[in-house]
């Protein structure tokens, strides 16, 4: 949770080379996967764990944990650990993240997200994507194609965190209180996205 918060803060601190505000304004959910790694122990070579929070009628939801694996994007990062961010930009993207498991590019359409001021003017993603994907590797933040990557619910870690089994949809729709340990992360997400709406 703390690692995901750090990734978000560092990426958003790069004012001219970050997620464009028009995308932040439309976001329905955000998934952050710190240090996605490449290794032979997973089919497809890539594996990572992260957290998801979704926008509700009264703010941002308590988080749940996810796993990401597979895909053919490893060549894009040179085999290095990389931080990933997935932004759901409409209700279809949100519905994908509510599923037990889905494949990017198959069950949900995705595109490499635009970055910075040039990305602010781009609207191509509105026509084609439910999810926008970003990576940060060795300090470089950019859109990345994650087609073929599977995203699944990490029920075990979520249960450990909450102390009881949780229904992911129930949590992400705002029906579960944010645990004290997750408040800084959720507050950070709300802060950055509120800034976007305020045009700051």
Regions found by a protein language model. Give the residues of each.
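Small-residue-enriched, tightly packed secondary-structure blocks
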Residues: 1-200
């Amino acid at each position: 949770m703390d690692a995901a918060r750090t990734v978000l803060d560092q990426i958003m601190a790069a004012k001219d080379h970050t997620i464009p505000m028009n995308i932040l304004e439309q976001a329905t959910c955000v998934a952050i996967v710190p240090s996605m790694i490449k290794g032979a122990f997973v089919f497809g070579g890539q594996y990572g764990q992260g957290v998801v929070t979704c926008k509700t009628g009264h703010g941002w939801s308590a988080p749940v944990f996810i796993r990401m694996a597979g895909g053919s994007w490893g060549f894009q990062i040179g085999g290095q650990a990389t931080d990933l961010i997935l932004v759901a930009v409409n209700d279809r993207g949100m519905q994908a993240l509510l599923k037990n498991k889905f494949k990017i590019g198959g069950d949900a359409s995705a595109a490499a997200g635009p970055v910075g001021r040039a990305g602010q003017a781009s609207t191509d993603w509105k026509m084609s994507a439910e999810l926008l994907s970003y990576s940060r590797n060795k300090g470089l933040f950019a859109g990345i194609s994650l087609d073929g990557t599977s995203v699944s619910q990490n029920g075990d870690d979520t249960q450990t965190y909450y102390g009881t089994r949780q229904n992911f949809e129930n949590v992400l729709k705002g029906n579960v209180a944010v645990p004290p340990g997750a408040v800084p992360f959720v507050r950070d997400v709300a802060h950055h996205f509120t800034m976007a709406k305020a045009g700051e």
